[in-house]
């Protein structure tokens, strides 16, 4: 597996994990972000950044961003995003 494939696989896995909660569970903590250390599927030591951001106005869809990079080379990292849409019938306030 190439370095890029390895970082992408780790980012996809983390993005899937980051999107396991629904909009209502994440909304009360948005905006939020964190960085932690971990390992890729191929065993590389990397940093994972996870962020939950409003995709527009507060209370709109939530954009989830995951970046995976080797500590010495942020610019060569992989960044993936996904949206968690707001349920139009969800009447909870943020």
Question: Would you name each region that the model predicts?
Answer:
Residues 1-94:
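Flexible, low-complexity segments enriched in proline/glycine/serine and punctuated by aromatic residues
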């Amino acid at each position: 597996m190439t370095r890029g494939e390895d970082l992408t696989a780790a980012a996809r896995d983390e993005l899937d994990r980051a999107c396991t909660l629904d909009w209502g569970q994440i909304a009360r903590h948005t905006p939020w972000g964190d960085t932690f250390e971990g390992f890729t599927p191929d065993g590389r030591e990397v940093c994972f950044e996870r962020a939950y951001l409003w995709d527009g106005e507060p209370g709109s869809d939530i954009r989830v961003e995951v970046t995976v990079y080797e500590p010495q080379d942020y610019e060569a990292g992989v960044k993936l995003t996904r949206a968690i849409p707001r349920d139009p019938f969800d009447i909870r306030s943020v």
